[in-house]
Each structure stands twice: as C-alpha cells, then as structure tokens.
C-alpha cells in the first residue's frame, strides 16, 4: 500500500551536512520525494508539530532545538513509507536503540539531537503533512 510520510532533517543533520547522505538513503530504500523544502521553523509551527509533548519537561528544549537552525522538510511516498522510513531512521536513542546501518545508528549521538523525524502513523502523517505542506 502506498503511503505518504513527513520526514524532517533536523537542525543537527543540516548543520553537520548530512542532508545529501540522508536523502540518498531515502531514495536507495525505494521511496520517492514528493516535496522537499529547506526552511526555518517558527515557534508556532514547532509548537503545533510537537503539541503532543506540551506540558512535558523537555517541551521547551524541543522547541528551542527545532527552531535553532534550518530544517529540511519532505513528503516521502512509497509502499509502507511510514514504517520504511522509521526503519531507515533507527531507534530514537541513537546510542542505545539505533542499530548500525540506520541513520541514527551511524550518525547520531544524543536522543535530542537524533538527526531526523518521521511520522509514526497514518494519522500523524496526515496531520504533519498538512502542517508543513498545507498546499500538498
């Protein structure tokens, strides 16, 4: 089944010049980039994107991080795109949970600075794509 998912290359991935490597891995997996944009994230967009974490102790630092530099936002499409990208990304904790061969396992060091975001469900993908690409 063809799905769409939102992929973000977070400020640490952009700053470390890993955009080409990450995009290449997405394409080599067989997924298609439907839309791609380099942008600075507003506080409002960040708060909407991470609304499920509002009230948690790490919420403010999450917003500070995602707005700290440019982000690459992409709509990625393909068979089981949500699960396929999450497998490619690796576990949220790059050191303890992400295995070598994944984006986070190969390049990540800290949970907060874990390079990429991918939608975790069809519902999340629809909501996140509408936030980041309202005309898509």
From Swiss-Prot:
TM ranges: none
GO molecular function: ATP binding; metal ion binding; nucleoside diphosphate kinase activity
Cofactor: Mg(2+)
Gene3D superfamilies: Nucleoside diphosphate kinase-like domain
Residues noted as binding ATP in the record, renumbered to the chain: 10, 58, 86, 92, 104, 114
Subcellular location: Cytoplasm
SMART domains xrefs: NDK
Protein keywords: ATP-binding, Cytoplasm, Kinase, Magnesium, Metal-binding, Nucleotide metabolism, Nucleotide-binding, Phosphoprotein, Transferase
Record flagged with keyword Transferase: yes
Family from the record: Belongs to the NDK family.
Subunit architecture: Homotetramer.
Protein's name according to its UniProt entry: Nucleoside diphosphate kinase
Annotated source species: Mycobacterium avium (strain 104)
Lineage of the species this protein comes from: Bacteria, Bacillati, Actinomycetota, Actinomycetes, Mycobacteriales
Gene: ndk
